[in-house]
Amino acid sequence: MTPHISAKKDDISKVVLMPGDPLRAKWIAEQFLDQAKLVNEVRGMFAYTGQYKSKTVTVMGHGMGIPSIGIYSYELMNFYEVETIIRIGSCGALAPQLKLKDLVIASKAWSESIYAKDMGVEIPEDKILFATSSLVELAKETAIKNKLDFHEGLVFCEDAFYQTRKDVISLAKEKNSLAVEMEAHALYANAILLKKKALTLLTVSDSLVTHEALSSELRQKSFKQMALLALEMTQKLI
């Protein structure tokens, strides 16, 4: 038990899927997990543990932004001894080749956030942190097996959703960032610090290139494909 998670240690699987929205965690549990049990609802951040194809999986929301996922992923890895966290979320396309609904495997992330530095993680000059390579390969293999197209590469992890500094977005494009999101850098920092495994999977929900955006219905449909990809990955991790 922590200040933010009330679950018993045995209630949390060694592999956790983390959407940003706790209601999506609830939806995944209801749609895909057998014998799903609510194990946390502190601050409305729902966590469910259940069975997917006879393997025990936990699905828990992480909230919005670096500080939020920083807290939840750290507590899961450090106090609940979770070995692997896969974030499943949305992103905004920065690269012209990314279309709405495309799947992005974020093998690396960069940010101007000081979170990683504050946690004592050594930051390279380019500020890029990497996902766990074995998870990146597993995600690609699983996507190919399930005939899902994907893009793999660098994402920009920003602190401000309503970003007004145009130079930051320009810099992100100059670094060949595929997309922008708000959590991957902190998740990877915690995994590096605690010697755990982490990966971020993203669905393109809007484009900063074409200024298009998915409807709520299409967001849910594309999110379903990504959630199933992550769930299929768990079969090789547990």
Curated annotation (Swiss-Prot):
The keyword Transferase applies. A purine D-ribonucleoside binds at H4, E181, M182, E183, S205, D206. It catalyses: a purine D-ribonucleoside + phosphate = a purine nucleobase + alpha-D-ribose 1-phosphate; a purine 2'-deoxy-D-ribonucleoside + phosphate = a purine nucleobase + 2-deoxy-alpha-D-ribose 1-phosphate. Disruption phenotype: Probably essential, it was not disrupted in a global transposon mutagenesis study. GO terms for cellular component: cytosol. Pfam families: PNP_UDP_1. The active site is at D206. HAMAP family: Pur_nucleosid_phosp. Belongs to the PNP/UDP phosphorylase family. Catalyzes the reversible phosphorolytic breakdown of the N-glycosidic bond in the beta-(deoxy)ribonucleoside molecules, with the formation of the corresponding free purine bases and pentose-1-phosphate. NCBIfam families: deoD, PRK05819.1. This is Purine nucleoside phosphorylase DeoD-type. The gene is deoD.
